[in-house]
């Protein structure tokens, strides 16, 4: 099936050919051909009966144990004999599966479906197929709700391959020596006739209660894991491409389909009257995105902490949907969802960004919830931030080829340990990306850069085209540290282990394990539920069924450090040391009398948490093999050379290998190979009660890990006389420690940001053994303790508990050698590793557990006395050895246990000794019990001394880490603040220079151009007005003077002389008079009129305009400068004060928390000592244990947990901030909670009107705008008070402020619409509403 390079899904998908998916691969170990459902015979035998395994050479012959059981009990032969399945590949080493408790949801739901679906028709959307039913004659064990399900365990141990270097290549067709690809343990859930299509996306979603998967027509099937109730959700009209639950404990399901429909379902159960409960799905959101026609795989992604926010990709667009705003007040319908075109988005839907090609995957960062990554077929991934139209980062991770997946992965140890994993075409090439900053830590910034640290390339050497060999689906399980890839073309599942390291840049893919499945996986999802078991449950949509595979985490981890030296230097294959345990064979033991092996406990898990180096370590998954006797009767063993002790037991020891300095600071662990060869007490002998498996927890302060030891009950010797007992009465099981990967969804607090360590976890597990047994209480220590090497002390348990390992047929007991290897490493120290190897004999006594039992031995137990030797004499010798070896350390207790176990092994080889010979043994047992108690007291004293050092060391480490972090944060904040101040100062200086230059240019232009023209125009106008006035004043005077002069001249003389002089006289007088009059008139009236005209013209036109222009210009410059400087100074001061006050407060809280934890640990340690002393004094009194359980349950640790888990009242913190006059911080904290009741309470605690009247304002414009919006959203409650507050707030808002310029208009419009809906309020409120609406309208007009 070819796939175009521009799309991860095939174009124009033809009818799917199942032959392609089931095409045999070139795997040298092909999976067995199996039809659905898988054969049940051999695997049910492995799961629920005592295991009888035939080696490869004699697989077709009945085993000796089977023959023996046929002779002993013919009634149980039909139960125990199952034909071994013939495999088409070499039989792997023995893999003994331990029986699990019924935590498997697939097991439970299948059993319930078998009862609820008998004879009931199935809806036409889901093909009707009968689920496999198990015959009750084959399984004598009862299950709740009906017959047991089919659970097919894995038949061989995996052997993976190490991934070394920055570019690792894994060829799926090449098998190195020793590599094994087993089939996974599978539990069918339901038969399913799917429409096989190879497309990306999650077609199945699982949480703690429900399993949801899509059907052909777009409907969604919902199954209750616990009750097997079923329901069908209808709404999608085409295939569902993606679905996801908000969280594992929240029943909110989001789904999206090809037709662009987005649904959010709130799943609930209820019943009407006495009817059977029904599953119902309330539609929280029904939306159809229009505008993208050719969409292949829409995706959906929840916000990490907000149930009302989800992100959806439709075609090339990435949308953010707020379910509280979309269709507010409307009732959604599945038949008619709300329409939302991309070119005209409705309220509550906004576009985050867009790609050039279709979006293939979405992922949101849990730590920094403003970061969202999207991948596309255009070859890019883009990292988006809230409220920014452009992406922060655009990467082309796979050289421009389509990107099929992009996922943020967060370390479970540190929430700020973030990496990005991308997948190329067909998810064949996987890359790890980290931030390019120091050590890869992701810090808030406006621009980012990422770099690739490692690449994993999957290739096929037999297929020339990658499309014919690969189509991988990818999921990342951050808590388990796994990256799972399901290859539908090869029926394979690849588990890639992630080693997080001490920093993001140190994260590596270091190990790859391959598993085979029976049919192609079309889509899958993984969970860590139940948290008690170190397993991952993978729920798969396959071509013929919905199935659940169980993946043991210990099978996906690289070998421990001890086995590093066994690897070849020229290959990447990891080789583990085989631990071989020999069996002591007394003279009376026949080769055909080998005891049957019921189960081998899976290796336990150590979780070591440290701030400097986060480690997740697992012991190696090593199967301890017995000596297998071939037909010729010669026992053979394989493995390392063994040394034979004096008793004839062979102990396999690990070679002392050099440790890798590079790995010494990252991995620490131990492994405990155990053979469980103990029969168990029949069910009817326990008084009708089902016994729960005993286990003990070894506390180790350096790794703070937990180890499970499967402690089975012992079958009494008289069992052979009871014909009603069958081997199927075995109901023992193994229980795992408390959850390792349980991380519920939570909101990140500032202290978590600074400290980077998770809160303390403690759990108390009690287990009721039998009516007369004492209760055992195991308390898990705080996983953050520092590493201190503490010796393990093995304690002996009294054999009066009826736990003597006898076999009623062989008359002997096989002693078992246990080797414990304890490796301890201190963080950041890679120079040395301490090993403590010691052998101990495991028989009746269980390390780490002490029980007192006062019930006398029954008469039927007399057969346990050895007739071939003097028991009193042997006991005396053992007693003397126990006295000589008694001491406060590890060797004394282990030797006591070994000697006592040897004595019982020797005594149990005879069945004819009288009862009276057991009395010395009882006395010796009592004395040994006292020695064990003394050793216990010494161990407690050593633990007390060892606990003080770790607490002090942890306090110092915490202090140093906090100091470094605070110093680094303060320095970065100060540098950023100083850089911002300098930048703003430079900007202001540049603006001032620009304004001054503009003023100079304007003044120059005015003086050179406009002033001359205006002055000339004014002069001309005034002269034109002065001329007529001057003529009117001068002409009458001239006329009068001329007439008077003429008259005078005529009067003086007549004649020639008079006439001659008349002309001269008239001219002289006329000139003098005219000149004098003109001068006088001009000096008096003309000059004054000219000056007044000029002055009035200049004053009326030139000077006012010039003064007005200059004043306006200078006022604008001054106001802008003063405002900018004031706002910048206030913002810088507030940011500086808030940053330092927050750091100081966080530091104070961190120190207080650390002190309280240290005090609680000290008190708990003292209480533990007192309780253990009380237990020793109580002896065989079972009532004392009950009181101890009561004391421990109500002890200081429980009170501390209740104190830690109690939620903090936000009003207390807000009151403190108000008392300190930190109004900005208090309002910001209240508004960020998105709780209007808290905001209203805060407004009522302060004088908001007086606060807003201060100068400068103590609240920033952003806080005021947010306060206005939140008060408006809850205006229906306490309307009058909120309107008064809104009136004061809206009067203080400056819409031209650059801080809120982008957000002011949409928020004003929203508030205006809310007030518009409340216009019909009472009369006293109408005026306030209109006033606020008028002010908002004015601001909106000013914002245009």
From Swiss-Prot:
One GO term (biological process): mRNA processing
Spans of the WD repeats are 235-275, 354-394, 397-443
Q: Where are the membrane-spanning stretches?
A: none
The record, for InterPro entries, names:
EDC4-like, EDC4_C, EDC4_C_sf, EDC4_WD40, WD40/YVTN_repeat-like_dom_sf, WD40_repeat_dom_sf, WD40_rpt
Function, in words:
As a component of the decapping complex, involved in the degradation of mRNAs. Essential for postembryonic development, especially during the formation of the shoot (SAM) and root apical meristems. Required for normal patterning of internal tissues of leaves.
The entry describes its oligomerization and partners as: Homodimer. Component of the decapping complex. Interacts with DCP2.
What is the protein name given in its UniProt record? Enhancer of mRNA-decapping protein 4
Q: Where is the composition biased (Polar residues)?
A: 1-11, 616-627, 884-896
This entry's Gene Ontology molecular function terms read:
mRNA binding; protein homodimerization activity
Q: Which residues form a coiled coil?
A: 925-946, 1147-1178
Induction pattern: By auxin.
UniProtKB keywords:
Coiled coil, Cytoplasm, mRNA processing, Phosphoprotein, Repeat, WD repeat
| Phosphoserine PTM sites in chain numbering | 98, 660, 692
Extract the ranges annotated as region (Disordered): 1-88, 616-649, 711-735, 762-815, 845-896
Which tissues show it?
Answer: Present in seedlings, roots, hypocotyls, cotyledons, leaves, stems, shoot apex, siliques and flowers. In leaves, particularly present in trichomes, some stomata and vascular tissues.
Q: What happens when the gene is disrupted?
A: Lethal phenotype at the seedling cotyledon stage that are small and chlorotic, with disorganized veins, swollen root hairs, and altered epidermal cell morphology as well as leaf and shoot apical meristem defects. Altered RNA decay. These phenotypes are suppressed at low temperature.
Compositional bias, Low complexity, is annotated for 59-79
Q: Which SUPFAM superfamilies match?
A: WD40 repeat-like
Organism, by scientific name, is Arabidopsis thaliana (Mouse-ear cress)
């Amino acid at each position: 099936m070819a796939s175009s390079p521009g799309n991860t899904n095939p174009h124009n998908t033809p009818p799917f050919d199942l032959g392609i998916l089931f095409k045999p691969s070139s795997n040298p170990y092909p999976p067995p051909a199996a039809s659905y459902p898988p054969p049940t015979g051999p695997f049910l035998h492995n799961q629920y009966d005592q295991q009888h395994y035939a080696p490869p050479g004699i697989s077709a012959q009945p085993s000796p144990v089977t023959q023996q059981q046929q002779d002993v009990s013919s009634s149980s032969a039909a139960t125990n004999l199952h034909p071994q399945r013939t495999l088409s590949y070499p039989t792997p080493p023995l893999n003994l599966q331990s029986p699990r408790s019924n935590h498997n949801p697939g097991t439970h739901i299948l059993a319930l479906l078998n009862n609820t679906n008998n004879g009931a028709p199935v809806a036409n959307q889901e093909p009707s197929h009968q689920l496999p039913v198990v015959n009750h004659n084959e399984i004598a064990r009862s299950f709740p709700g009906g017959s047991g399900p089919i659970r097919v365990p894995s038949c061989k141990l995996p052997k993976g391959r190490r991934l070394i270097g920055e570019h690792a290549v894994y060829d799926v067709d090449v098998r190195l020596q020793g590599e094994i690809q087993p089939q996974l343990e599978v539990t069918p859930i339901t038969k399913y006739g799917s429409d096989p299509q190879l497309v990306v996306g999650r077609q199945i979603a699982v949480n703690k209660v429900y399993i949801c998967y899509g059907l052909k027509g777009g409907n969604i099937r919902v199954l209750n894991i616990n009750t097997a109730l079923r329901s069908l959700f209808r709404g999608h009209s085409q295939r569902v491409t993606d679905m996801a639950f908000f969280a594992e404990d929240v029943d909110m399901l989001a789904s999206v389909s090809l037709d662009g429909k987005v649904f959010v379902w709130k799943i609930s159960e209820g019943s009407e009257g006495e009817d059977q409960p029904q599953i119902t799905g309330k539609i929280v959101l029904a939306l159809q995105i229009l505008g993208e026609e050719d969409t292949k795989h829409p995706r959906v992604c929840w916000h990490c902490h907000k149930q009302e926010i989800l992100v959806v990709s439709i075609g090339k667009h990435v949308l953010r949907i707020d379910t509280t705003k979309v269709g507010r007040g409307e009732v959604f319908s599945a038949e008619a969802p709300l329409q939302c075109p991309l070119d005209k988005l409705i309220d509550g839907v906004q576009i985050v960004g867009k790609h050039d090609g279709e979006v293939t995957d979405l992922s949101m960062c849990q730590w920094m919830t403003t970061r969202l990554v999207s991948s596309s077929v255009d070859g890019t991934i883009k990292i988006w931030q809230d409220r920014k139209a452009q992406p922060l980062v655009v990467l082309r991770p796979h050289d421009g080829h389509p990107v099929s997946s992009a996922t943020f992965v967060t370390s479970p140890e540190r929430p700020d340990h973030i990496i990005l994993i991308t997948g190329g075409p067909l998810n064949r090439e996987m890359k790890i990306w980290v931030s390019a900053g120091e050590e890869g830590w992701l810090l808030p910034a406006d621009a980012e850069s990422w770099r690739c640290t490692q690449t994993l390339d999957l290739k096929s050497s037999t297929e020339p085209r990658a499309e014919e060999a690969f189509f991988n689906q990818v999921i990342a399980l951050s808590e388990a540290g796994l990256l799972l890839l399901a290859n539908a073309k090869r029926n394979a599942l690849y588990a890639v282990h992630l080693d997080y390291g001490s920093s993001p840049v140190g994260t590596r893919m270091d190990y790859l394990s391959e598993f085979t499945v029976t049919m192609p996986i079309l889509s899958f999802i993984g969970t860590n539920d139940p948290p008690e078991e170190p397993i991952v449950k993978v729920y798969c949509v396959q071509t013929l069924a919905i199935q659940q595979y169980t993946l043991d985490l210990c099978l996906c981890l690289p070998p421990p450090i001890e086995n590093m030296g066994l690897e070849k230097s020229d290959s990447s294959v990891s080789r583990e040391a085989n631990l071989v345990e020999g069996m002591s064979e007394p003279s009376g033991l026949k080769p055909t009398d080998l005891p049957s092996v019921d189960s081998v406990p899976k290796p336990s898990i150590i979780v070591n948490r440290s701030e400097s180096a986060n480690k997740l370590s697992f012991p190696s998954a090593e199967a301890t093999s017995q000596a297998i006797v071939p037909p010729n009767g010669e026992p053979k063993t394989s493995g390392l050379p063994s040394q034979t002790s004096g008793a004839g037991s062979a102990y396999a020891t690990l070679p002392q290998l050099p440790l890798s300095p590079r790995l010494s600071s990252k991995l620490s662990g131990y492994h405990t190979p155990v053979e469980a060869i103990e029969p168990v007490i029949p069910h009817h002998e326990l008084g009708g009660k089902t016994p729960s498996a005993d286990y003990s927890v070894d506390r180790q302060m350096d790794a703070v890990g937990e180890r499970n030891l499967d402690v089975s009950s012992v079958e009494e010797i008289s069992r052979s006389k009871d014909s009603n007992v069958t081997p199927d009465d075995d109901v023992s099981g193994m229980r795992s420690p408390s959850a390792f990967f349980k991380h519920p969804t939570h909101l990140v607090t500032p202290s978590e940001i600074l400290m980077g360590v998770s809160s303390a976890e403690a759990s108390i597990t009690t287990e009721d053994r039998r009516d007369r047994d004492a209760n055992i209480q195991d308390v898990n220590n705080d996983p953050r303790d520092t590493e201190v090497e503490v010796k393990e002390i093995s304690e002996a348990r009294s054999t009066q508990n009826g736990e003597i390992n006898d076999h009623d047929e062989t008359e002997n007991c096989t002693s078992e050698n246990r080797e414990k290897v304890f490796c301890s490493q201190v963080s950041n120290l890679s120079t040395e590793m301490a090993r403590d190897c010691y052998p101990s004999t495991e028989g009746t006594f269980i390390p780490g557990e002490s029980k007192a039992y006062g019930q006398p031995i029954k008469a039927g137990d007399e057969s346990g006395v050895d007739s071939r030797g003097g028991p009193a004499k042997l006991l005396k010798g053992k007693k003397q050895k126990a006295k000589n070896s008694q001491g406060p350390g590890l060797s004394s207790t282990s030797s006591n246990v070994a000697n006592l176990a040897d004595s019982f092994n020797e005594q149990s080889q005879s069945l004819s000794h009288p009862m009276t010979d057991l009395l010395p043994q009882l006395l010796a047992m009592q004395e040994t019990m006292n020695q064990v108690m003394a050793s216990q007291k010494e161990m407690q004293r050593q633990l007390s001394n060892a606990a003080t050092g770790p607490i002090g060391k942890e306090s110092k480490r915490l202090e140093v880490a906090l100091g470094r972090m605070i110093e680094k944060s303060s320095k970065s904040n100060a540098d950023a603040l100083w850089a911002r101040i300098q930048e703003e100062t430079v900007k202001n200086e540049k603006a001032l220079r620009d304004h001054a230059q503009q003023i100079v240019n304007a003044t120059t232009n005015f003086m050179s151009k406009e002033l001359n023209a205006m002055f000339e125009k004014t002069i001309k106008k005034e002269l034109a007005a002065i001329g007529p006035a001057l003529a009117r004043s001068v002409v009458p005077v001239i006329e009068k003077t001329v007439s008077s002069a003429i008259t005078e001249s005529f009067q003086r003389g007549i004649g020639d002389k008079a006439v001659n002089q008349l002309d001269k006289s008239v001219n002289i007088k006329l000139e003098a008079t005219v000149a004098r009059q003109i001068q006088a008139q001009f000096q008096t009236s003309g000059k004054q009129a000219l000056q007044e005209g000029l002055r009035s013209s200049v004053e009326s036109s030139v000077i006012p305009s010039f003064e007005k222009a200059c004043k306006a210009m200078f006022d604008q410059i001054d106001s802008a400068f003063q405002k900018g400087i004031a706002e910048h100074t206030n913002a810088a001061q507030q940011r500086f004060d808030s940053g330092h006050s927050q750091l100081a407060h966080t530091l104070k809280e961190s120190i207080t928390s650390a002190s309280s934890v240290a005090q609680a640990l000290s008190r708990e340690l003292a209480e533990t000592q007192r309780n253990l002393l009380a237990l020793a004094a109580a002896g065989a009194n079972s009532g004392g244990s009950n009181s101890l359980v009561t004391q421990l349950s109500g002890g200081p640790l429980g009170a501390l947990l209740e104190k830690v888990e109690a939620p903090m009242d936000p009003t207390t913190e807000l009151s403190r901030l108000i008392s300190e006059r930190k109004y900005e911080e208090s309002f910001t904290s209240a508004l960020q909670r998105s709780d209007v009741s808290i905001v209203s309470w805060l407004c009522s605690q302060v004088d908001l009107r007086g606060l807003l009247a201060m100068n400068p304002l103590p609240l920033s414009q952003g806080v005021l705008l947010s306060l206005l919006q939140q008060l408006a959203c809850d205006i229906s409650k306490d309307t009058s008070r909120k309107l008064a507050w809104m009136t004061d707030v809206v009067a203080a808002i400056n819409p031209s402020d650059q801080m809120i310029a982008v957000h002011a208009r949409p928020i004003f419009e929203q508030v205006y619409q809310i007030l518009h809906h409340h216009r019909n309020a009472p009369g006293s409120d109408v005026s306030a509403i209109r006033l606020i609406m008028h002010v908002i309208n004015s601001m909106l007009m000013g914002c245009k």
